[in-house]
Amino acid sequence: MDSSEMGPDSWMKIVHAIAEHYHDYDGFVVLHGTDTMAFTASALSFMLENLSKPVILTGSQLPIGMLRTDGKENLITAIEIAAARENDMPLVPEVCIFFENDLLRGNRTSKTNADNFNAFRSYNYPPLAHAGISIKYDIPQIYHPVSRKPLKPHYLLDRNIAILKIFPGISPQVVESILNIPGLKGVVMETFGSGNAPGYDWLLEMLKDAVERGIVIVNVTQCLAGSVEMHRYETGRKLLQAGVVSGYDSTTECAVAKLMFLFGHGMTPDEVKEHLNCSLIGEITIA
């Protein structure tokens, strides 16, 4: 399957396969196309609650049958990381992406290059490990579960989520068409800089109306690095007053997956907002 066709149904199959064989293996490697790998990694991080074993996603920019493929090294190292243990405990008990020598937290990662082997970056969180002659792990950065509870797989996701990308000259018709999608529950709004958008009266009114109708709007920055701080500028404060929720330093991929996960649990809009304001599995940084 081309990864462009991956989505919630595929994520559920992966979760089911891991849950079914969870006690048979020390770790898991998921081979995945690069285009939507960050979406899948983000979703799996929420869907595999109480995960205590490595789940490493990897793939290649060049098909593995080609002479210069990056796939062989990515696969071999991903397997080594998935099997790595210290004091009889997994070294990396979380969902990660391994690509071009770097191990990255899955829900912090985005695909940032379509042509180079270093296709993935995690700008707001440091790599968990770097592979050279040896693999050097940054242990303090690795997420470790607080307690050893049994794995709790989740299969319910709500797809009534949309992405609204703000751009100069955006029209009322564009915003209205998105905010009035039948059944819409959540919107990931990509804004400028530290969470800013034009202060158009019509835009603020549309956002406020959507929030009052129970639609959760989470604000993430279009920048590759940095965090949303809606208190910093007047334009951001107006979004806050309209009821828009901060996404902090979340990636768009993670924000989409998190909304699908939270609404999939039947949460009310207020409950979803409450969970957006906390880090569930190391996906955001809250100062």
Where on the chain are the PLM-derived regions?
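Short beta-strand segments
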Residues: V30-H32, I56-G59, P93-E100, K165, ...
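Short Gly/Thr/Asp-enriched flexible loops that form oxyanion-binding sites at enzyme active sites
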Residues: V30-K53, G199-M206
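Gly/Ser/Thr-rich loops at beta-strand to alpha-helix junctions
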Residues: H32-A38, L103, G193-N196, A225
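C-terminal non-catalytic interaction/assembly regions of soluble proteins
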Residues: T191-A287
